[in-house]
Amino acid sequence: MDLSLRLLRHGYDAVAADRAAHGVPPDAGTHATRLVGHRAVVVRSEPGVRFFYDESAAERKGVVPPPLAWLLFGRGALHGMDGEPHRDRKRAMVDVLSADGLGPLVGRVAQELDEAAATWPGREVSVHPTLVSAYGRAVLGWAGLDLDDDRADTVARRLSQQVDGFGFAGPAYVRGWASRLWWDRYATGLAADLRAGRAGTGADAPAARLVRSIDADDRTAGVELGNILRPTIAVSWLGTFAALRLADLPAWRERLADPGEELARMAFAQEVRRTTPFAPVLAARATRPATIDGVRVRRGDRLVLDIMGIDHDPARWEAPHEFRPERFLEHAPGAFDLVPQGGGHPAGHRCPGESLTLRVLEATLRVLAGVPYEVADPAVDLTRMPTTPRGGLVIRVPAGAPGRSARASTPGSA
């Protein structure tokens, strides 16, 4: 069976199922298979991951079929580029997501979450859509897009539906494409207005700076604007799993509520990323032959990065199937050991939003840790990509519970 069919059937366990079907030992670092009809090599060992991220050995353009690539990233986006054009476009986008620029965005996330949490006592709350709204309002405001709350919620929902549909999950895939077409129309006009100074809060706002820096037409600039906004909203999947994990770990909840425990919150966020990545695999194409762990790679073969296998590899992680945030307090992972959003070095194809993801999760954990709640149904369907606990994780917050995080009472907080 083609690995693409196993992904549809088994979801996050697809590569493990493929390995078993080919009679490959569970601890094998590399094995050959087929992906969308092409010979493919699945890589998990460090030599394999290094080859996957070597720009002289692998390329991305045209590897992910347009029905998926264009849904999630948009036609003509950075994610399908290679070489100098990729580096130039990425520099423009990383500049907008610089460390100095992330502080105001994370502050907006914390403020939106504090305001939402104040309404939770005495209610049942579905965490995932709540985070989509909070993160969406935060990133749209930070970007300098002057939208009222209803419009911001609509844009956030449309961007989240693109993420929700990438796993070919039936109706979610259809909704995802409807939202992709909606966004491309909306964002093309928005990019033109931003470039002309007819929209936004000013020429120095992130959205305006980005569309001016993209050397392409308004449609492509709008696509890349979505690729700056959508990743923040996509953190809602990880934020939902952070809420699920926190409910089971009262000692960690107490610790993470302390405003001074930022490093502990970062460690918890890293463990959430390790155990619940967005996707089980990434794909590329080999541009030169090689032999990896005894498996021959031919020019033109597909390369499949086994994200789930790497992030749960016993050779890299002690007790890999246990949730242990403290592992990230003890040592920092290498560039090829923790790959929930891809690996390698920042100048290459490593996700430029990785730092943003961690900081948004850290702010989310600080709010969640300050609110007592119980989980109604923790069941998770691992065959669906991307996945959340059932119902987006419904939590019950008792009446009279504190509805704001420790941040809300700290000096200088908004």
Question: Over which residues does each language-model region extend?
Answer:
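Cytochrome P450
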Residues: 1-414
